[in-house]
Swiss-Prot record:
Displays methyltransferase, positive regulation of the poly(A) polymerase and transcription elongation activities. Involved in the modification of both mRNA ends and in intermediate and late gene positive transcription elongation. At the mRNAs 5' end, methylates the ribose 2' OH group of the first transcribed nucleotide, thereby producing a 2'-O-methylpurine cap. At the 3' end, functions as a processivity factor which stimulates the activity of the viral poly(A) polymerase OPG063 that creates mRNA's poly(A) tail. This is Cap-specific mRNA (nucleoside-2'-O-)-methyltransferase. It is found in: Virion. CDD domains: capping_2-OMTase_Poxviridae. It comes from Fowlpox virus (strain NVSL). Gene3D superfamilies: Vaccinia Virus protein VP39 (3.40.50.150). It comes from the Viruses. Residues 177-257 are annotated as: Binding to NPH-I. GO terms for molecular function: mRNA (nucleoside-2'-O-)-methyltransferase activity. S-adenosyl-L-methionine binds at residues 46, 74, 76, 80, 103, 105, 124, 147. Interacts with poly(A) polymerase catalytic subunit OPG063. Interacts with OPG109 and OPG123; these interactions might help linking transcription to capping and polyadenylation. Its EC number is 2.1.1.57. Keywords: Elongation factor, Methyltransferase, mRNA capping, mRNA processing, Protein biosynthesis, S-adenosyl-L-methionine, Transcription, Transferase, Virion.
């Protein structure tokens, strides 16, 4: 059991957070009237991305998948201010990566002077993916990160999402990455258009996502198994909606009991669980997980100009 709580309480007893969608067992019918909070703090979006990408890249480090002949291809990377932290984190670990950042929007200026970072100012289509594949040396392994989103900059329609997922499938098929982190939010059942396919992967739940976000990251490693696609139908969409609404209304707003940390809110508990196992250079040693996570949180919040 992950947690034990009563409906009326605003506290949880948990030994670990829900990290992946398949761990969610509770369901809650969607209720638009409950979606009354859109409060976000400055830098929250970049924090969400940074924590998810730290987890993803650390998984590859521990699996000995990530090494110095690797190119990180990040499509939809702007503004990307969090990438500066990732870059210096990898540099501290002496992992000499190459980065290709691609977006038609403007990137944070702090990225322009970084060594081995190429910034390409354009949006991606199938034709450009073939060109990109030919640009990258054949002996370089590709790790793909995608954060593509609607050109309108608003909540995407189901048609927008289907277009994005078809494009992400092309990214995986053409670039042939050894691993990928893809943006993933199932279209809502009441806006359903048609069934579609996505790559198999672990559906990573994002700490510090907006309060009622149903977005996840689809994490896949292809070095041990070929790419497989799974079909998503309307029944799956109903399950996604109910379980993500349960997570966002019954779990994330609460505090975690017996969690010895300055902030006991669920998203901080989740962040703690990710950061406590992050690989660090050998010269950075801590006597407790709490010391380690406080150190990392301060570094991350300072990098993103977040006021705790």
């Amino acid at each position: 059991m992950h947690e034990g709580h009563q409906e009326s309480f605003k506290e949880l007893e948990m030994t670990k957070p829900y990290m992946f969608f398949n761990e969610l067992v509770g369901e809650e019918d969607y209720n638009k009237e409950l979606e009354n909070s859109n409060t976000k703090f400055q830098g929250q979006g970049q924090l969400k991305l940074l924590l998810g990408e730290l987890y993803f890249l650390n998984t590859l480090i521990k699996n000995k998948t990530l090494c110095s002949d690797t190119v990180i291809v990040y499509i939809g990377s702007a503004p990307g201010s969090h990438i500066n932290f990732l870059y210096h984190y990898m540099d501290d670990l002496k992992i000499d990566l190459k980065w290709i950042l691609i977006d038609g929007r403007d990137h944070d200026r702090s990225l322009e002077s970084l060594k081995n970072v190429s910034i390409i100012h354009r949006f991606v289509d199938e034709q450009y993916l073939f060109k990109l594949r030919n640009m990258i040396r054949k002996n370089h392994k590709i790790v793909l990160i995608s954060d593509i989103r609607s050109l309108r900059g608003k909540e995407p329609t189901s048609e927008d999402l289907l277009h994005d997922y078809a494009l992400q499938n092309q990214m995986v098929s053409i670039l042939k990455p050894i691993a990928s982190s893809l943006k993933w939010r199932c279209p809502f059942p009441d806006q359903w258009i048609r069934d579609f396919y996505i790559p198999c992967g672990d559906e990573f739940l994002q700490p510090f996502a907006p309060p009622f976000s149903a977005e996840m990251r689809l994490l896949s490693c292809y070095s041990r198994a070929p790419i497989r696609l799974i079909r998503i139908d309307k029944n799956a969409a109903i399950e996604y909606e109910k379980k993500m609404f349960y997570l966002n209304t019954k779990i994330r707003p609460k505090i975690v009991l017996d969690f010895d940390y300055p902030n006991q809110k669920y998203d901080y508990f989740y962040m703690f669980y990710i950061l406590k196992d992050i690989v660090l250079p050998t010269y950075k040693e801590f006597s407790t997980y709490k010391q380690k996570v406080i150190f990392l949180q301060e570094a991350i919040f300072n990098a993103l100009n977040i006021k705790p």
